[in-house]
Swiss-Prot record:
The modification Phosphoserine is found at residue 57. GO terms for molecular function: intraciliary transport particle A binding. Signal peptide: none annotated. This is Intraflagellar transport-associated protein. Seems to play a role in ciliary BBSome localization, maybe through interaction with IFT-A complex. One of its GO terms (biological process) is spermatogenesis. Keywords: Phosphoprotein. One of its GO terms (cellular component) is cytosol. Pfam families: IFTAP. It comes from Bos taurus (Bovine).
């Protein structure tokens, strides 16, 4: 058989490449409908049929298990576990049992599988379990009934946040005594209600004769005066004299 030359091999490769390119260029253009057909669309009926088929196949798999050596303890435990799984898979389809007071449900560890996997569990709270008078009513009376920005009026006597401090000056002959403010008598009375009350001045109080609390102490005032005197002296020395 004659051996192929390198030129023939190159020609064969070129032909193969041309054939592949021709198939690719001349192939049928896929439409959008054909593109959608490549996907699998599941309906509700298909899902329910698959679930039913899955449960039947799982039941058949559990029933097809055969144990040849039943006398050994390990095999007995395995059979109990298989039966427990079989009953738990059917508990969603069968009726669930409501356990009353004094009754118990079986477990796979004790070997009693009569009610295993069929017990109905109550995960909801009944209205009877809640004490409406103690829990709900105080919350409604304290939180819900209050208006926005309103405060509970539990304290009858309210202390004002600011009480003006008035210095008592000794009375000298020839000067008019200045009125003093008593904290207990002049406390503002709290007006209960949401209505806006008009503002009015106290006619008995002399607002012009109020003695204000000094900002600086006498020692600080003396120090400030000394500093001002020194500044004036230094300013006079720096200025040229005519």
């Amino acid at each position: 058989m004659p051996a192929k030359t390198p030129e023939l091999e190159m020609m064969d490769e070129d032909r193969l490449i041309e054939e592949v390119l021709d198939k690719f260029v001349n192939c049928h253009e896929q439409t959008y409908e054909e593109f959608l057909r490549t996907f699998t669309h599941l309906s509700k009926d298909n899902v329910t049929k698959r679930e039913a088929f899955g449960t039947n196949s799982s039941e058949n798999n559990f029933t097809s298990i055969k144990f040849t050596q039943r006398n050994e303890p390990n095999d007995c435990r395995l059979s109990n576990k298989a039966i427990f799984l079989h009953t738990s898979s059917q508990c969603s389809e069968e009726e669930q049992i409501m356990i009353g007071d004094g009754q118990k449900a079986g477990s796979s560890f004790q070997g009693d599988l009569n009610r295993a996997g069929k017990v109905k569990v109550d995960n909801f709270l009944d209205i009877e379990d809640l004490d409406l008078d103690e829990e709900i009513n105080p919350q409604l009376s304290k939180d819900v009934l209050l208006l926005p920005g309103q405060v509970e009026q539990e304290v009858s006597l309210s202390v004002p946040s600011y009480i003006p401090s008035v210095a008592i000056q000794p009375v000298t002959p020839g000067t008019k005594p200045r009125p003093t403010v008593k904290a207990a008598d002049k406390q503002s009375k709290e007006i209960v209600g949401d209505e806006v009350q008009p503002f009015s001045l106290d006619e008995e109080f002399d607002y012009d004769a109020v003695v204000l609390t000094p900002k600086f102490t006498p020692a600080e005032m003396n120090a400030i005066k000394e500093l001002s005197k020194q500044k004036t002296k230094s300013a006079d020395l720096e200025d040229p004299h005519d």
